[in-house]
């Protein structure tokens, strides 16, 4: 099979700093003594707890029931006893209702869990139902419920599924390790997704700095002519949904539209692998790969870890802090979220825990815009970040909206390239919040 090539216009080349974990063997987290399972592990309506303090639970048992279509159940990632159902700190910065489970160390699987069979055994509806029951969401970070993504509206026509294996965010190597160690499951998950939405074409996009992953996927695909691997130019944000679609299909997703409007379903390679895993074992999404890294970590590593394990436990399993951290980020340096405590749990969308020293975490003092236009040149959406940010700082929300602020994907390329060190993406993010607030008010 020939590997094809592609990229998009714009983007940046930050230091990728992936070597410290890409070249280290995958680690496997120890059995946790306690897990915290938030009722909000996905975009959409939070779940309602269906267990109470003192209950005994099995691994894989539902502990939270979804509310509404855009929601998925949450499951116990250990067997043991529920010791609390209460609000706990969450990666969003809020306190969220959570089920706290003390592990019995046995990992006794819920007896109702059975393998689903094979690809041939399952029809489209059965795949969607399995994906919902397994609590599968986008594992690239967005955590959008996957069964919703697979439920194509009648007025939309899709003709392909694209898997995102770009992993363009600096430091992170979770998807890289997944593609090299579970290539067969990634490909099987792609086939299941294709069958679910009724298409005969599938693509996997991987940045060209991951040649071993590309080789593993090509081998797993074999002679299936319906599937293709794209070697994508190493550039940030190559893994952004619209940029990935443009690089592989040449199609442009219109402003305000979704991938389905361009005839495409996009999902992360980790999501695809989990779909296959759930079919084979019957188990829900209860663990994931994540990268614990940064210059404040003693032994950076990508590790397989249970959902609900506190960040501090993951950090300790990677040797602990090498020095006092100046910043701890859930995710990567470009789009991750800074955390103020390390007792928050690993979420379904936690792709990384990035710990930076105080020196590395220093923020430069911004100065006045010099109108160099660099932010315009690198914007993958072809916006004018300098103008939108200026309007935002003047509270000119209508101007922000007319300059397409809502199309911003908040990738941070503009802030990174700005020689004046202006916090452009932060200003645009404020504008987007205000625009949404005004729309809700009907203004």
Curated annotation (Swiss-Prot):
Protein name listed in UniProt: Na(+)-translocating ferredoxin:NAD(+) oxidoreductase complex subunit C
Keywords (A to Z) from UniProt: 4Fe-4S, Cell membrane, Electron transport, Iron, Iron-sulfur, Membrane, Metal-binding, NAD, Repeat, Translocase, Transport
Pfam families xrefs: Complex1_51K (PF01512), Fer4_10 (PF13237), RnfC_N (PF13375), SLBB (PF10531)
Compartments where located: Cell membrane
Cell membrane among keywords: yes
GO MF annotation, one: metal ion binding
Entry binding sites for [4Fe-4S] cluster 1: 369, 372, 375, 418
Gene Ontology cellular component list: plasma membrane
Annotated function: Part of a membrane-bound complex that couples electron transfer with translocation of ions across the membrane. Couples electron transfer from reduced ferredoxin to NAD(+) with electrogenic movement of Na(+) out of the cell. Involved in caffeate respiration.
Family: Belongs to the 4Fe4S bacterial-type ferredoxin family. RnfC subfamily.
EC code(s) of this entry: 7.2.1.2
Topology versus the membrane: Peripheral membrane protein
Organism of derivation: Acetobacterium woodii (strain ATCC 29683 / DSM 1030 / JCM 2381 / KCTC 1655 / WB1)
Span of domain 4Fe-4S ferredoxin-type: 359-391, 398-428
Assembly with partners or alone: The complex is composed of six subunits: RnfA, RnfB, RnfC, RnfD, RnfE and RnfG.
Main location: membrane
Gene from which this protein is expressed: rnfC
GO BP: electron transport chain
Named cofactor requirement(s): [4Fe-4S] cluster
Co-factor binding details: Binds 2 [4Fe-4S] clusters per subunit.
Binding positions ([4Fe-4S] cluster 2): 379, 408, 411, 414
Catalytic activity reported: 2 reduced [2Fe-2S]-[ferredoxin] + Na(+)(in) + NAD(+) + H(+) = 2 oxidized [2Fe-2S]-[ferredoxin] + Na(+)(out) + NADH
